[in-house]
From Swiss-Prot:
Name of the protein this chain belongs to: 4-hydroxy-2-oxovalerate aldolase 3
Residues of the active site: H17
Coiled-coil residues: none
Binding site for Mn(2+): D14, H196, H198
Record CDD domains: DRE_TIM_HOA (cd07943)
Pfam families associated with the record: DmpG_comm (PF07836), HMGL-like (PF00682)
Species of provenance: Nocardia farcinica (strain IFM 10152)
Disulfide bond among keywords: no
Alphabetized InterPro entries for the sequence: 2-IPM_HCS-like, 4OH_2_O-val_aldolase, Aldolase_TIM, DmpG_comm, DRE_TIM_HOA, PYR_CT
Length: 338
């Protein structure tokens, strides 16, 4: 492989789900400084559900996006400051404010079959001169050719890169391979392809490796896998594998290991790992950020979290429908008491 990998850290965006969007700007600054020194190419910062995601439905943040982004900007020297925006949650005004604070790259995220709602936000980001990626969430819910059609739409709106985004940690290596190949068949050769993996089936590193073998150049990863559900692709083992394969990148493996163990793991109030609940996310194909919501409902109503998650998967809930988890719990409770 001759192309250098672009490794984007998502500890401070997807990882917000793992700490219920509660982290101090001081901790953000420390983590960003460590990541920057370790050579990652980009660092994504926002509420777990993107700009303006803090709410009763998604979970309020301990601080505003702007406080976190300012703390990140103050500690960056080399890496590209990045954020995430979901149309319908974040607005053009939020995007413009992020740009004023130093954000120069954005991922515009939609459900995997709803790329058309990203057009305005992608176009505005391009007008601002930003690096722009399309982020097709829950990519396992669309077959490869259908997903590629959505990627083609995002490209037509101006995206420099489009991601296969395995939000549920449900894809296997064949699923990743098929989707990346489908993208490559329809996208312009100049348009990059990215992979965003979750660890719910313990396949995040394997899926990311397969993606790179198929031509992906942008890889999402996080310190200690810090992210929703069982976490994202853990950056330390992925970089180790990249070294073993001789792939070009700019990361310092030992520095990443130190940041993961010394800065990130101590912040976790629930271990980010594959366990009975997070494995069920991948098994049922459930949006990874639903984990903490389902666990809260299970505690409240005396149910098994896995039972709730299986029903969430059966009903095909997607990101933004967190409020329906309580409805499902009440339905299950009624069934057990009938």
């Amino acid at each position: 492989m001759t192309t250098r990998l672009f490794i984007q850290d998502v500890t401070l965006r997807d990882g917000m789900h793992a700490v219920r969007h509660r982290i101090t700007p001081e901790d953000v600054g420390r983590i960003v400084a460590a990541l920057d020194a370790a050579g990652v190419d980009a660092i994504e910062v926002a509420h777990g559900d993107g700009l303006a995601g803090g709410s009763l439905n998604y979970g309020p943040g301990s601080n505003t996006d702007w406080e976190w982004i300012e703390a990140a900007a103050d500690n960056l020297t080399h890496a590209r400051l990045t954020t995430l925006l979901l149309p319908g949650i974040g607005t053009i005004a939020h995007l413009e404010q992020a740009y004023r604070l130093g954000v120069r790259s954005v991922r515009i995220a939609t459900h995997c079959t709803e790329a058309d709602v990203s057009a305005q936000h992608i176009a505005t980001a391009r007008e601002l001169g930003m690096d722009v990626s399309g982020f097709l969430m829950m990519s396992h819910m669309a077959e490869a050719e259908q997903l590629a059609e959505q990627a083609e739409l995002m490209e037509s709106y101006g995206a420099h890169c489009v991601y296969v985004t395995d939000s549920g940690g449900r894809l296997t290596m064949d699923g990743v391979r098929d989707r990346v190949r489908a993208y490559r068949r329809v996208l312009d050769p100049a348009t990059e392809i990215g992979i965003h993996a979750h660890e719910n089936l313990s396949l995040a590193v394997a899926n990311s490796v397969v993606a790179v073998e198929e031509g992906v150049t942008r890889v999402d990863a996080s310190l200690a896998g810090h992210g929703a559900g069982a976490g994202n692709c853990p950056i330390e083992p992925f970089v180790a594998v990249a070294d073993l394969y001789g792939w070009k990148h700019s990361c310092d493996l030992f520095a990443l290991q130190d940041a993961a163990d010394d800065l990130v793991r101590p912040l976790q109030d629930r271990p980010v790992r594959v366990d009975r609940e997070t494995l069920t996310l991948g098994y049922a194909g459930v949006y990874s950020s639903f984990l903490r919501h389902a666990e809260a409902a299970a505690r409240r109503y005396g149910l098994d979290t896995r039972t709730i998650l299986l029903e969430v998967g059966r009903r095909g809930l997607v990101g933004g429908q967190e409020d329906l988890i309580v409805d499902i719990a009440l339905d299950l409770l009624a069934d057990t008491t009938a």
